[in-house]
Curated annotation (Swiss-Prot):
Subcellular location: Cell inner membrane
Family: Belongs to the TatA/E family.
Protein name (record): Sec-independent protein translocase protein TatA
Transmembrane segments: 1-21
Function field: Part of the twin-arginine translocation (Tat) system that transports large folded proteins containing a characteristic twin-arginine motif in their signal peptide across membranes. TatA could form the protein-conducting channel of the Tat system.
GO annotation, biological process: protein transport by the Tat complex
Subunit field text: The Tat system comprises two distinct complexes: a TatABC complex, containing multiple copies of TatA, TatB and TatC subunits, and a separate TatA complex, containing only TatA subunits. Substrates initially bind to the TatABC complex, which probably triggers association of the separate TatA complex to form the active translocon.
Length: 79
């Protein structure tokens, strides 16, 4: 009883269509869809950038570890 029924939603939708017209609603929907798509693209490129930075940091750490191991093995060979 306290909730909004389907009939009430249909009446509201009909009033909105009558007030704004279908062309205006279509353009608003397209603009909203474009904004959502742009936001998703921005978020995915940000995540890709972070992933690249993480992988670069891991590679740097691995190369540092490898260099340290080589230095230790040379020290052992000299001793």
């Amino acid at each position: 009883m306290g909730g909004i029924s389907i009939w009430q939603l249909l009446i509201i939708a009909l009033i909105v269509v009558l007030l704004f017209g279908t062309k205006k609603l279509r353009s608003l929907g397209g603009d909203l869809g474009g904004a959502v798509k742009g936001f998703k693209n921005a978020m995915s490129s940000e995540e890709e950038k972070k992933a690249l930075e993480d992988s670069a940091a891991e590679k740097k750490a691995e190369s540092t570890d490898t260099a340290e191991k080589k230095a230790e093995s040379k020290d052992k060979e000299q001793a």
